[in-house]
UniProtKB/Swiss-Prot annotation:
Belongs to the FrsA family. This is Esterase FrsA. Keywords: Hydrolase, Serine esterase. It catalyses: a carboxylic ester + H2O = an alcohol + a carboxylate + H(+). Pfam families: FrsA-like. InterPro entries: AB_hydrolase_fold, FrsA, FrsA-like, FrsA_esterase. The keyword Transmembrane does not apply. One of its GO terms (molecular function) is carboxylesterase activity. It comes from Salmonella dublin (strain CT_02021853). It comes from the Bacteria. The gene is frsA. It is an enzyme of class 3 (hydrolase). Its EC number is 3.1.1.1. Catalyzes the hydrolysis of esters.
Length: 414
C-alpha cells in the first residue's frame, strides 16, 4: 500500500472519534497558574495541550509553520468539547489538532515522494514524521486518531532512514510475559560494533522524536543510539507503565550482547524527564552493563511525591501520567497515591550509593524537576556530575548542555 493510500485509509472523514482532552476523566480539574519549562514548553491560555515550541523547533519544524497550524486551529468555528480551548475541535476535520498537523505532514510527505534527490527526500520524510508525531501529541491511550497519526509517523521515519546518512535497523526484542517490543538502532558511518546510548524518552514523546539527538550529537562522535518507546505508547503500547518502570529497557539492555552492531561493553543510558526514572533505575539494577547514565530535567522523586508540586502541573501532563498508569477515571488523590510509588527514593534506590557514573542537568525553577532532584542523583553516584543550564537564551543553552552531556558520555564510553 502506498503512503498516500495509507493516509486516505486511516483518515477517513468521521466525526465520532473521542476528542483528546476528554479521554482522561479526572474529577478534580481546576485552573492552573501559568507555567513554562525548557523541555515541556508552556501552558498557553485557551489551549489544552502544552505548546512545546523549543522541542518542535529543535526537531526541525520552522517557527512560522507552528504558528500557521495554530492559526488554522484558532480560526475554526467547528464544534469544540470546551469552547474555551482552541484545540478541542470534535472529529477529524478542519480545526481539529490532529487533522491540521497531519494535513501539514501530508504536504511534506507529498514533497518527499516527488523529490528526486535522496538526501532531500529523506529530510522531507523526517519532517513529515515529526509533524505526524506532533499531531499525535500527547499520545493518550485510546486516542484512535492519534494512533493513526503515529502509524504514519513511524512509516515516514522508516522512509527517511533509508535515505539519510548512516543506517537504521528496526529490531524486535522479546520480553517475558508479554508482547515483544520494537526498537530502532541508529548507527553512524563506519564499521561496528559501536559504543551505544540507550535512549529513555519522556512520557509525552515517541522514540522517533530523537533523531536530532543522534544526528547532531552522537553520530559525529561515532556513537550509535538505540531508541525504545516507553511502556503504554507506540511500539510498547501493549505494556502498561508500572513501578518497575525500567522493565522493557532492562530486557533490551540484557539482549545487547546478541546484537552484532552494538559494543555491549560500552553502553550508556540517557533519560529525558520521566525517562530519567528508567535510566537511573538501570544505573542501580544493571550497573555491570552500563558505563554511564545521563539525565536531563529528571522526574525521579519530587513531582511523584509532592502534592503541592503536582497541583502546579498543567492538566495535560497530569492526563499523560494518568493515561500511562491506566488510571483514566482516577481522582487526583488516587493518582497521587499511585505516583508516590514511582519515586525512586520511596522505592529505596535513590540515596543509596550507586557505582555507575551519573550526570544530571537541570534548569532553575523547573516546575517538573527542581535542582534537588538532580543533586540527589549525582550525590548518590560514586562519580556524579551536576550541570545547571541557564534558561535564556533557551535554544542555545539547550544545545550547549547537550554538547557537554554528549562529551561526558563519550569520555566514559571510550
Amino acid at each position: 500500500m502506498t503512503q498516500a493510500n495509507l493516509s486516505e485509509t486511516l483518515f477517513k472523514p468521521r466525526f465520532k472519534h473521542t476528542e483528546t482532552s476528554t479521554l482522561v476523566r479526572r474529577f478534580n480539574r481546576g485552573s492552573q497558574p501559568p507555567m513554562q519549562s525548557a523541555l515541556d514548553g508552556k501552558n498557553v491560555p485557551h489551549w489544552y495541550r502544552m505548546i512545546n515550541r523549543l522541542m518542535w523547533i529543535w526537531r526541525g519544524i520552522d517557527p512560522r509553520e507552528i504558528l500557521d497550524v495554530q492559526a488554522r486551529i484558532v480560526m475554526s468555528d467547528a464544534e469544540r468539547t470546551d469552547d474555551d480551548l482552541y484545540d478541542t475541535v470534535i472529529g477529524y476535520r478542519g480545526g481539529n489538532w490532529i487533522y491540521e498537523w497531519a494535513k501539514q505532514a501530508m504536504d511534506w510527505q507529498q514533497k518527499a515522494c516527488q523529490e528526486q534527490d535522496a538526501m532531500r527526500s529523506g529530510r522531507y520524510w523526517l519532517h513529515a514524521s515529526t509533524l505526524y508525531n506532533i499531531a499525535a501529541y500527547p499520545h493518550l491511550k485510546g486516542d484512535e486518531l492519534a494512533e493513526q497519526a503515529q502509524a504514519l509517523a513511524n512509516r515516514a521515519y522508516e522512509e527517511a532512514a533509508q535515505r539519510l546518512p548512516g543506517s537504521l535497523r528496526e529490531m524486535e526484542f522479546a520480553v517475558p510475559g508479554g508482547s515483544p517490543v520494537t526498537a530502532f538502532l541508529h548507527m553512524p558511518k563506519g564499521d561496528g560494533p559501536f559504543p551505544t546510548v540507550l535512549m529513555c524518552g519522556g512520557l509525552d514523546a515517541m522514540q522517533t522524536d530523537y533523531y536530532t539527538l543522534y544526528e547532531r550529537y552522537f553520530a559525529p562522535r561515532g556513537i550509535a543510539m538505540l531508541t525504545l518507546d516507553m511502556p503504554s505508547v507506540g511500539f510498547s503500547s501493549k505494556w502498561k507503565l508500572t513501578q518497575d518502570s525500567s522493565l522493557l529497557h532492562q530486557h533490551v539492555l540484557k539482549a545487547l550482547p546478541n546484537v552484532p552492531w552494538v559494543d555491549h561493553t560500552r553502553v550508556a543510558a540517557f533519560g529525558f524527564r520521566f525517562g530519567a526514572n528508567v535510566a537511573v533505575r538501570l544505573a542501580y539494577l544493571e550497573a555491570p552493563r552500563l558505563k554511564a547514565v545521563a539525565c536531563l530535567g529528571p522526574v525521579v522523586h519530587a513531582l511523584l511525591s509532592d502534592p503541592q508540586r503536582q497541583s502546579t502541573v498543567p492538566e495535560m501532563y497530569l492526563d499523560v501520567l494518568a493515561s500511562r498508569l491506566g488510571m483514566h477515571d482516577a481522582s487526583d488523590e488516587a493518582l497521587r497515591v499511585e505516583l508516590n510509588r514511582y519515586s525512586l527514593k520511596v522505592q529505596g534506590l535513590l540515596g543509596r550509593r550507586c557505582p555507575t557514573p551519573m550526570l544530571s542537568g537541570f534548569w532553575k525553577n523547573d516546575p517538573f524537576s527542581p535542582e534537588e532532584e538532580s543533586r540527589l542523583i549525582t550525590t548518590s553516584s560514586s562519580d556524579g556530575k551536576l550541570i545547571e543550564i541557564p534558561f535564556n537564551p533557551v535554544y542555545r543553552n539547550f544545545d550547549r548542555a547537550l554538547q557537554e552531556i554528549t562529551d561526558w558520555i563519550n569520555h566514559r564510553l571510550c
